[in-house]
Amino acid sequence: MAALRPARTSVAEKKTFKLHALSAVVMGLCASGQAYAQTESTNSNKKEEMPVVVVIGEKTERTIYDTSSSVQVFDQETIDNTPGATEIDDLLQLIPNMVDSGQGNSMPTVRGIDGSGPSIGGLASFAGTSPRLNMSIDGRSLTYSEIAFGPRSLWDMQQVEVYLGPQSYIQGRNASAGAIVMKTNDPTHHFESAVKAGVGERNYSQTAAMISAPIIQDELAFRLSFDQQKRDSFVDLASYEPAGDAKKIEMNSVRGKLLYEPSALAGFKTTLGVSHMDSRGPQSESTNVVGNEAFRPVYETKSLSTAWDISWQLNEVLTFENNLVYSKFAFDRYTNPLQKGDYTAEGKEFHVEPLLRYLSLGGRVNALVGARYYKSSQDDEYVDATSANPMSGSTKTQSAFAELTYALTQSIDVTVAGRYEKERVKRKVSDPRFKLDHDDTLSVFLPKFDIAFKPDMAQTFGFKVAKGYNSGGAGLAFNPILGGGFSPYQFEEEYIWNYEFYTRHRLGNSVELMTNTFYNDFDSMQMTQTLSNGDVLIANLDNAKTYGAEIGTRWYATDSLELFANLGLLKTEYKEVNGTSKELERAPNMTGNLGGQYSFFDGFELSANAAYTGDYFSDRSNTEIVKIDAYWVANAQLAYVFENGRAALFATNLFDSDKTTLYARGSLNEPLKQQPRMIGASLQLNF
């Protein structure tokens, strides 16, 4: 299966664009696509038929032509063909309307919305805020610290799906901006194994292995995988105790799975998996290292999770499934004792999600109904030179959801979905001086409506509307004028209404064209604000909106050449508490990428891509002096595929661009820059 990436066309960037003009362009593309599809191909050199992309991240397996979400899919083959791709961040630069600034507190923005949530750093620690971007591995949603600082290895990965736009109605909490769904490979009933070694500049290394084998033929099988990646930061950081060498970056991932498919129980399958992940590295790779900045805080994360999945086809039309996950996690932030600001956290999570699928014999009705129970607790502590500040938090979520797709006619499908969710959030700072003891319960209904017109198997035109949300909370305001303050406050939940027009086109057997045009209307958007008295806190805004489009194409030009292109267009606007209109931070008007893969001789593969990010503001106040200029990054890889393996030579940031991607905390003294060029090689052997 090849990857789908919302296509980009080569278009000159404009500072602004009107939604009606954008829609006209998209409609024009759609019309031309339909006309093309109705024309018989006359090119005798066309390659084999393009495979159809299948997505699984919305709890239902469906083709891309039946999927309304703006999604990009990377399967194992596509990951292998992406230059230097060994962890999830290597793929995110190929997502339109997504900006990943590099290692630091900030998660990627999605369509201009900060995936980290309304705040980062100490303000977020006290408030216990929730991310807006959900990242899950085998059904377990990662915590903020694991996403921002932790390991997200791509080794032995079956598929990665990146969804742009609210996924709350299907994913639940922490998905109002989007979702990244990662599915690892299951055990196989035949023997297979692989080892991989990689080396590169800045002491980069990767050591990975995998083995899968049957225990009882065609019934019981196991799979084990391991991946370790190391490198040195490109920033010249100091060593100090207790952190050690702040330049050292390391991630480890270990997984084990058992698959049981008893022959005596037809249609029944269960998988039990255990996963350990840990990482360490500087909290940020911003380049200011003068004075004490060289003693960069070091963040360590670790987690251990157990997942139990059941799938049982009860009869021809009904299938029961259940996902149960239990996790324990811990995070540690080490700092220079002369400027001590250590942070530690320990917590645990449990969730269970049963669901029932129905597919009518004629295929006219496709439905699912399910429920989810989630419970988490966390104890954390902030320790400075003079005091320790213990904190605690817990979340309990109960939800029920359903989705029904009904074929009104042979060419019109209607989908209705809804999720009712009740969430109780507690947050307490134990120090009586701060008087923070928050306990709030929220109930919310999240509907979705989708109508799709399919004139033939290779064409889809659709419109959908869906609601998303992010839960509220409480925290301690910081006042830099007073050098502290720490007054308690509360903020409300935020809501988003998402409207999208989408098209899917298969042009002959060699070209795909995908478009999603969106408008997002936010109610009570959460954002860090500075009040007139100097308090810095999370506040709810009256008005915010984003609109734009993702356009993607994939072309099998010949048997040996595959090309792709992606374009993201975006406009954002919000009003501060004082009524001033601003753009959202890290929200460029244009993003784009293009690339391809060429096979030649016998087993050689050349792949390359280039990604463009337009200019954007680094801070919420739209300060011109910390505005980020547009930048490019290019990557290339030459691989040789042989019977029992693959050898590759790769270069990331091929032209060694060193543009600034973010000014941390809006300060010119802390620029975060593109990682320098890395040249490396890898060898994988399959047995």
UniProtKB/Swiss-Prot annotation:
Subcellular location: Cell outer membrane
Record keyword Membrane present: yes
Topological category with respect to the lipid bilayer: Multi-pass membrane protein
Pfam families: Plug
The UniProt record lists the keyword Nucleus: no
UniProt main location, coarse: membrane
Matching InterPro entries: Plug_dom, Plug_dom_sf, TonB-dep_rcpt-like, TonB_rcpt_b-brl_sf, TonB_rcpt_CS, TonB_sidphr_rcpt
Stretches assigned to the TBDR beta-barrel domain: 190-687
Gene ablation phenotype (knockout): Unable to use transferrin or ferric vulnibactin as iron source, but able to use heme, hemoglobin and FeSO4 as iron source. Reduced virulence (increased LD(50)) in infant mouse model.
Domain TBDR plug: 63-185
Induction note: Expression is up-regulated by low iron concentration condition. Iron-regulated expression is repressed by Fur.
Keywords associated with the record: Cell outer membrane, Ion transport, Iron, Iron transport, Membrane, Receptor, Signal, TonB box, Transmembrane, Transmembrane beta strand, Transport, Virulence
SUPFAM superfamilies (UniProt xref): Porins
PANTHER family assigned to the protein according to its UniProt record, in alphabetical order: FERRICHROME IRON RECEPTOR-RELATED, TONB-DEPENDENT OUTER MEMBRANE RECEPTOR
Similarity remark: Belongs to the TonB-dependent receptor family.
Described function: Involved in the uptake of iron in complex with vulnibactin, a catecholate siderophore synthesized by V.vulnificus. Binds and transports ferric vulnibactin across the outer membrane. The energy source is provided by the inner membrane TonB system.
Protein name according to UniProt: Ferric vulnibactin receptor VuuA
Source species: Vibrio vulnificus
